Amino acid sequence: MPCRREEEEEAGDEAEGEEDDDSFLLLQQSVTLGGSTDVDQLIVQIGETLQLDAAHDRPASPCAAPGPPPPQVLAALPADKTGTPARRLLRPTGSAETGNPAPPGAVRCVLGERGRVRGRSAPYCVAEISPGASALPQQPGLDGPPGTGKLSTPQPLSGPCRRGWLRNAAASRRLQQRRGSQPETRTGDDDDPHRLLQQLVLSGNLIKEAVRRLHSRQLQLHAKLPAHPFLGPLSAPVHEPPSPGSPRAACSDPGAFMGRAQLRTGDDLLVPGS
């Protein structure tokens, strides 16, 4: 029937209009703003309305535990004579907390100073652990209260943790063995200079190896040199006196040399004496 369809459509439109009206906040009377005190009172009223609407329509947060109710807005403080704006105070009710306290270690949501009204100042749900026993598991290495710091016997690992630990231990043991046997392989691989150079570059001991070889070569050269009496330190050279029969002594002291020499005549030849 066309009449019934029209009535049903009108009823559906009215229901949708009522739902739309419920989703908006309408002011029943106009307010004339005369000063900062009126503005603060209007803000407090809007906050109360939004808080009640949010608590009535929206379900509780998934991370919220059955704990204290949302904080209630106290009456606004009256402005003083100088005209400074009044501030609103937020305080959770103590009777609800004492009657139904949250269990120790429970996680609850902290939405900031505006209670459950989520704005730019508190847009996220911050998890807070209530005082009491910690919700986290106790560390296996500590025994007793956290403040004592007593060590307990470590429990053996099981499953994939044990396999990963054994794999890491075996890898570290192989690495230590490789580092310990590195000097032996170095002495055996002296015949291959390219491989030795590659190992030194990868290990970062190229400069140390060069200094060690230079020092050992210098020691070998000092060991091969013969012990000469005239060799001495460069800072204090040794000057030996010239021998009496050397031409250097004759040039330095010709009178003494001629006095020491004795001439012998024989076969018309001059022979210097000894």
Swiss-Prot record:
Give residues where Phosphoserine occurs. Answer: S243, S246
InterPro entries from the xrefs? GSK3-bd (IPR008014)
What segment(s) does the record annotate as region Involved in GSK-3 binding?
191-214
User: Which GO terms of type biological process are on file?
Assistant: canonical Wnt signaling pathway; embryonic axis specification; protein export from nucleus; regulation of protein export from nucleus
From the UniProt entry, list the residue stretches annotated as the region Disordered.
Answer: 1-24, 55-107, 132-194, 232-274
Maturation and modification: Phosphorylated.
* Main location per the UniProt record: cytoplasm
Subcellular locations according to the entry: Cytoplasm
Cellular component, GO, one term: cytoplasm
Q: Which tissues does the record link to its expression?
A: Highly expressed in testis. Lower level of expression in spleen, thymus and brain.
> Its domain of life?
Eukaryota
Q: Where is the composition biased (Acidic residues)?
A: 7-23
Task: Name one matching Pfam family.
Answer: GSK-3_bind
Q: Tell me which UniProt keywords the record has, alphabetically.
A: Cytoplasm, Phosphoprotein, Proto-oncogene, Wnt signaling pathway
Main function: Positively regulates the Wnt signaling pathway by stabilizing beta-catenin through the association with GSK-3. May play a role in tumor progression and collaborate with PIM1 and MYC in lymphomagenesis.
Identify the PANTHER family for this entry: GBP PROTEIN, PROTO-ONCOGENE FRAT1
What pathology does the entry list?
A: Activation contributes to progression of mouse T-cell lymphomas.
Assembly and interaction partners: Binds DVL1. Binds GSK-3 and prevent GSK-3-dependent phosphorylation.
What protein name is recorded for this chain? Answer: Proto-oncogene FRAT1
Q: Which organism is it from?
A: Mus musculus
Gene name of the encoded protein: Frat1
